[in-house]
């Protein structure tokens, strides 16, 4: 099991969904954030983490509010990837950030999720 970040934040969980495969879609915000990272090792670690999640191995993650989840990547400034799950097999990558911008990133992820749901999710993200 993961450990709590502090007393106010949910515990991180490690989950392996054996045999479960997820489809991934990303928002423009997420793609722009990832493309803007200069740290090549971080990019590789994030890409690997997303690939593992698509194969059912979410590793360390937690619910942050309103159906938005956070993948924690233990590298550099503490990178985070925010996503939500639509149905049983679709993961939508909303945005990314690091520990320093965590609260603003969570608010943005919630806003993006609400926007996608309001539109019905039938448009390009």
Show where each model-derived region lies.
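Basic, Lys/Arg-enriched alpha-helical interface segments
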Residues: 1-78, 87-91, 98-125
């Amino acid at each position: 099991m993961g450990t709590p970040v502090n007393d106010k934040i949910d515990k991180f969980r490690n989950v392996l969904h054996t045999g479960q495969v997820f489809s991934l879609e990303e928002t423009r915000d997420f793609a722009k954030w990832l493309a803007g990272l200069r740290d090549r090792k971080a990019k590789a670690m994030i890409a690997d983490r997303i690939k593992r999640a698509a194969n059912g191995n979410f590793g360390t993650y937690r619910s942050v509010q309103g159906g938005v989840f956070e993948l924690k990547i233990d590298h550099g400034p503490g990178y985070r990837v925010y996503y939500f799950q639509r149905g049983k097999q679709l993961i939508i990558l909303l945005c990314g950030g690091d520990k320093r911008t965590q609260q603003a990133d969570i608010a943005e992820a919630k806003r993006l999720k609400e926007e996608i749901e309001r539109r019905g999710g039938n448009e390009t993200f």
